[in-house]
Amino acid sequence: MLVKIKATANIPQSKFLSLSEKFRAFVAGFGSGKTWVGCMAMCSHYWSNPKINQGYFAPTYPQRRDIFIPTIEEVAFEMGLRVDIKESNKEVHFYNGRKYRGTTLCRSMERSETIIGFKIGRALVDELDVMPVDKANKAWNKIIARLRWI
């Protein structure tokens, strides 16, 4: 089955998506599409690396709900994927039709002690700059410790 990808990226976003570095950052202003391009990278990863789970990290769970969930629903649809949001588990499951592609585990960086006990191949770290530096550093170190499949 051939899937038509409808999502588009601007030039800076396209450059970001083509980076091969282990750790990459899309640093831009308000409304520039940082979360959008991160979600594009997430969906692209599920197409090329099925069943390698990923993580999404935001300062708080309400930010995950308000920023990530609507964006990933839209981007996944545009990229030929369907998402099933498991609110109670803080997970997003990705499918191509009925074929399972992977799961994104969502965690709050505000409580970095919850960033333990799982393996992921990629991480989307959103809004890290709004956290106090010490909390951001602690969360970052916990997140990169979860990256076991890279």
Which residues does each PLM region occupy?
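Phosphate/NTP-binding elements of NTP-utilizing enzymes
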Residues: 1-150
